[in-house]
Amino acid sequence: MSNANSFTKEDLIACGLGKLFGPNSPRLPKDNMLMIDRVLKINADGGEYGKGEIVAELDINPDLWFFDCHFATDPVMPGCLGLDAMWQLVGFFLGWEGAEGKGRALGVGEVKFTGQVLPEAKKVTYKLTIKRKVYRKLVMGIADATMEVDGREIYSAKDLKVGIFTDTTSF
């Protein structure tokens, strides 16, 4: 497990290259698909269930790539990108705890969208609480999460599932 409890954008980019937690650790996506600018807090025993929590942020500005294509005259951040960020953070948590392999989103129990991220927004905040960690032949994390834009909760997800696989050829 890493001793660090916060991470910069440079750290997150290093994670995408296999240079943060080691070459066999789960990687974050690179470039445009990395939907996180910083991890403010990560721990293994906090959160609602006492199994870990993560708080992370994404800075919003009108020049972000998705505003140009979703939609041409009605720019809004695609909801799937916020959901993907939540899966990214569950995988990041497992890598931070020392898991090795390739991360894959395995599903989500429930997702609710009650707002939107527009180009004039300033900041998205993700808050995840780990519900369950499985470290057997299958490594898996299950979490609940919320996403806020400028302090207002607009997405919630229950039972986000991410697995870490040493072999994905038959996946």
Curated annotation (Swiss-Prot):
Q: Which GO terms describe its cellular component?
A: cytoplasm
Name the catalysed reactions. Answer: a (3R)-hydroxyacyl-[ACP] = a (2E)-enoyl-[ACP] + H2O; (3R)-hydroxydecanoyl-[ACP] = (2E)-decenoyl-[ACP] + H2O; (2E)-decenoyl-[ACP] = (3Z)-decenoyl-[ACP]
- Keywords carried by this UniProt record: Cytoplasm, Fatty acid biosynthesis, Fatty acid metabolism, Isomerase, Lipid biosynthesis, Lipid metabolism, Lyase
| Residues annotated as signal peptide | none
Q: Name one GO biological process term.
A: unsaturated fatty acid biosynthetic process
Q: Does the keyword Cell membrane apply?
A: no
The record's subcellular location field reads: Cytoplasm
What binding partners and quaternary form does the record give? Answer: Homodimer.
- This chain's protein is named 3-hydroxydecanoyl-[acyl-carrier-protein] dehydratase
Task: Give the organism the record lists.
Answer: Shewanella pealeana (strain ATCC 700345 / ANG-SQ1)
Which gene holds the coding sequence for this protein? fabA
